[in-house]
Amino acid sequence: MLRLTLPAIALGTTLFLTAEIAHGQPASSGKSTPASGRTIAVSGTGVDLLTTALVHSKDSTASRMVQKSTEIVELTGDLTGRVLYQVTTEIDFVHKMLVNTGNQVYSGTIAGSAPVMLHDDRFRFQVNLATGEEHGRVYLADHIAGPKVRCTLDAKGTGPNAQGNPTFTYRGECTMGGR
């Protein structure tokens, strides 16, 4: 029988990022921010704090399950901060697939920038429950606060940590400035 914690495997990501950083102008915090319009490559790791998830609702049938929950993802590296993650998890038991969608807000820094807040309502994580393969895409594009920046990240699951929380690696790019 499938345990309910499997849906979160697709959610989890702790990010360690490396970036090619341009010389930038000081931000209001006094930290350097890569030059406006400059795109930097990023990569790293992350962890989904599944053990502290708040489950809001869960509906199940013999062939599928839908769960709505709120989780926190910790990021370190070039993206250093946290993600508040409100997720809808859909599990298709027949096809052995899990899909996560919903809303998330990132609060932290990017490549040493001043703090930013970015929203994403287009992310999608998939898990093949037969093989364990996990992957997803994140679109941190809706600016809320701080320097203007947009990031697109591809994530790949790396399994649970010692506490049972899902982990992942990611690669992508962030563009400073713009709309």
Go through each PLM region and give its residues.
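Beta-strand-enriched cores of mature, soluble protein domains
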Residues: 25-179
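Bacterial N-terminal signal peptides
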Residues: 7-18
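Boundary at the C-terminal end of the N-terminal hydrophobic targeting segment
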Residues: 19-24
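Positively charged n-region of N-terminal signal peptides that target proteins for export
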Residues: 1-4
